[in-house]
């Protein structure tokens, strides 16, 4: 989903989250922007093991992640767009 549909889903999740805990896994910038808390879940492997690492993101890290998932590269323009998404979410 994207655009208006993603925004509508984000609003529904926000409404549900007022009374219930919601955990959503997403690659949608708008959903990330609307979240109260963001976590990065990452798979880390070496030659012997695979681990899952979960990190609670700071506001700056959230902005960078929104920029990354919006366009793939963290550019000045992508950062400004991410800040605007976060501000208006």
Regions found by a protein language model. Give the residues of each.
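C-terminal lobe/lid and adjacent interdomain/linker elements of RecA-like ASCE P-loop ATPase modules
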Residues: 4-89
